[in-house]
Amino acid sequence: MRTTPMANASTIERKWLVVDAAGKTLGRLSTEVASLLRGKHKPTYTPHVDTGDHVIIINAEKIELTGKKLTDKIYYRHTMHPGGLKQRTALEMRTNYPEKMLELAIKGMLPKGPLGRQMFKKLNVYRGSEHPHQAQQPEVYELRG
C-alpha cells in the first residue's frame, strides 16, 4: 500500500520571491500572495506544515481598489481604552500606511493559529521599489492574470 508523501520541516526548500504591487488590485494580489505563503503552489504542499516561500512586496503605495472602495471602505482599530474605536478610510490607509493595508488583507486570508502566524512572518511589504533583501537573491514572481 502506498502512502502520500508528507513534507516535514527538514525537507522544505524555501525561495525568496519579489512581487510588484504597482497597478494590481488589492484582493487579487492578496489571494495569490497568501497562496505563496502557504505553499499551495508547490507539489509538496502539506496542510499541517509551513511549506511556503518568503514573499517581498514592493510598490505597496501603488495598489488599486475597484469601485468606490477608496472612499467607502473603512478600517477599524481599537486603542483598548474606553471610547477608543478609531477608523480610517481606505484612501487614508493607502496614503499613510500602504504596508498595513496589504498586510491586513493577506493576514485575513491565512489560517488562524500558530501555523498562520508563522506563515505571516515570511511576508515583507515595502513602499517604493527598494527592499533590503538583495542578499537573499529573490526571484521576480509574475502574478497570474
From Swiss-Prot:
Pfam families: Ribosomal_L13. GO terms for molecular function: mRNA binding; structural constituent of ribosome. Keywords: Ribonucleoprotein, Ribosomal protein. GO terms for biological process: negative regulation of translation; translation. CDD domains: Ribosomal_L13. GO terms for cellular component: cytosolic large ribosomal subunit. InterPro entries: Ribosomal_uL13, Ribosomal_uL13_bac-type, Ribosomal_uL13_CS, Ribosomal_uL13_sf. This protein is one of the early assembly proteins of the 50S ribosomal subunit, although it is not seen to bind rRNA by itself. It is important during the early stages of 50S assembly. Part of the 50S ribosomal subunit. Belongs to the universal ribosomal protein uL13 family. This is Large ribosomal subunit protein uL13. The lineage of its organism: Bacteria, Bacillati, Bacillota, Bacilli, Bacillales. The gene is rplM.
